[in-house]
């Protein structure tokens, strides 16, 4: 098993989208070598903040998607109209690099307060194949 890398608190790899007048900041936290590297998000009514972290963070983490070091990616809308998040994971349980790519469908649900809740369709993680 890879020793769990220790570092100062880190937030990096930001992506900001605006849905129905609210800004959503997706970010990665922890160091990429840490097995708990993960993705969370925060919301704000202004791109300058203040930002409010979502209470159900992280949305992508080894406990959710089943692989160490699951973080630092980007959001995109697929041809099917769904949102997806592409990210990387550790190579194996014993090696961080070279990292591998994963894509997970997002489940985006609008709450009564007008704020979208974002979770992942963890049973449908896409594992790209390379030729």
Report the location of each language-model feature.
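Carbohydrate-active catalytic/glycan-binding domains of CAZyme proteins
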Residues: 1-131
